[in-house]
Amino acid sequence: MLDTQSIIQAMAPELWLAASGLMLVLVGAIVGERFNSLSYKVGALVMFGAAALSAMHLQGGEAFNGLVKTTTFTNFTKVISFTLAGVAIFLSEGFLRRHEISRYEYPLLMVLASLGMGIILSANNLMTLYMGIETLSLSSYVLAAFHRDSARSSEAGLKYFVLGALASGILLYGASLVYGFTGTTSFDGLTLAGESVGAMFGMVLMIVGLAFKISAAPMHVWTPDVYEGAPTPVVAFFASAPKFASLVVFANVMFTLFGSVMDQWQLIVAIIAGLSMIVGSLGGLTQNNIKRLLAYSSIANVGYALVAVAAGQVLGAPALLTFSTIYVISSLGLFAGVLAMRRRGGMVENIQELGGLARRQPVFAIAMTVLVLSVAGLPPFGGFFGKYEVLRAGVEAELVPLAIILVIASVVSLGYYLRLLKVMWFDEPKETFERVDVTVLGTVVACAVIAGVVFMIFIGELGTGGWASYAASGLLP
């Protein structure tokens, strides 16, 4: 017999998102194009409502005979992810309207993708995990190709779909091997299952499939092309909410599902982390397209986050939450900034086009500078403290070579971060920027204040000694 109270405690946000998605479909089908403009505001409110429900049920629970299980670790991630998704929907309408592709299906797809995020974060069974991943992925493929009249957007969606399907197949095959050699798909059962060669091989395949979802090297090849070709508000969504959720799911799988065999996967995750940091820091140096540059930046930052995963549950989980929270907020702000910059009616795409931004729009340039320096991890901004926590976790876990790579990669990546700032502040303006939309400007400034200032001032309370440790405590037995 189903326990309604347990279901609500464990899955209130997902139930809300599923019901809201169905309502959006019905209203959109009945009202038609008249619902297009309102749908974005409704979609954003739906996401903020899901975040509020996650906060209300922060302690989590278990439902459906163990298929679903939530903790403070996953529910904290839901609060951040759903909030970022709501902001991403809110930012999208102006861009889509200018390109004449504003339709109610866009916020609907965002809601369904967020439903997938909620499911993977709540998963306590391999089948639930796969169902959530596919719900998120299928919505993401369509979002990447949402600008149907753009060849680049269609190409991005096709590449994402083909490579994503391959990664899903690898993940599913790995899960089937794990099930075949252990006899269970339950996370709780797998934690107690004995170690076997077949199950370890399945674990490696699952790591490969999940590494694609977080765009970690060497499974990163889709990221620059998709980031460049997909509509900018879609990329802002990809780089924030699903990125954060996927990183936490990766950590959750490693810490809970395979926590008892950490000695078998620690080196694999460390190698992926090292490759991601190297590829991300070096790859960005040659980029002229802003979105491709930020794609390589995201690959490097995934590598930094995986250092925390390789450090293990006790040391790594709080560091992962601290670093990832600051990074995704900064990343959303940066893409909102890219979304805001326009010249001659078109988007600013190349770094050289940023010339003179500080002279024309000083407030906007200051906010962008704070966000860039935060992502770069320079003190005294929030990103520095997040990266410091990851570095400390790596050193305490005796992953000294990985910590050295982290420091070197951070220094190398400064090359393209400082290049952005040099063009913005010191290059001569070539053309006048169009006026920045007040809503987008407010979002950029808010992200800069949160990521660059709030974390800088209150890092003692907000860091691994405070909320991050409390949220990560949900992983402890």
UniProtKB/Swiss-Prot annotation:
Keywords: Cell inner membrane, Cell membrane, Membrane, NAD, Quinone, Translocase, Transmembrane, Transmembrane helix, Transport, Ubiquinone. The chain crosses the membrane at residues 11-31, 38-58, 76-96, 107-127, 161-181, 192-212, 235-255, 265-285, 298-318, 319-339, 364-384, 398-418, 440-460. The gene is nuoN. This is NADH-quinone oxidoreductase subunit N. It catalyses: a quinone + NADH + 5 H(+)(in) = a quinol + NAD(+) + 4 H(+)(out). NDH-1 is composed of 14 different subunits. Subunits NuoA, H, J, K, L, M, N constitute the membrane sector of the complex. It is an enzyme of class 7 (translocase). Its main location: membrane. One of its GO terms (cellular component) is plasma membrane. It is a multi-pass membrane protein. Its EC number is 7.1.1.-. It is found in: Cell inner membrane. NDH-1 shuttles electrons from NADH, via FMN and iron-sulfur (Fe-S) centers, to quinones in the respiratory chain. The immediate electron acceptor for the enzyme in this species is believed to be ubiquinone. Couples the redox reaction to proton translocation (for every two electrons transferred, four hydrogen ions are translocated across the cytoplasmic membrane), and thus conserves the redox energy in a proton gradient. One of its GO terms (molecular function) is quinone binding. GO terms for biological process: ATP synthesis coupled electron transport. The keyword Mitochondrion does not apply. It comes from Hyphomonas neptunium (strain ATCC 15444). Pfam families: Proton_antipo_M. Belongs to the complex I subunit 2 family.
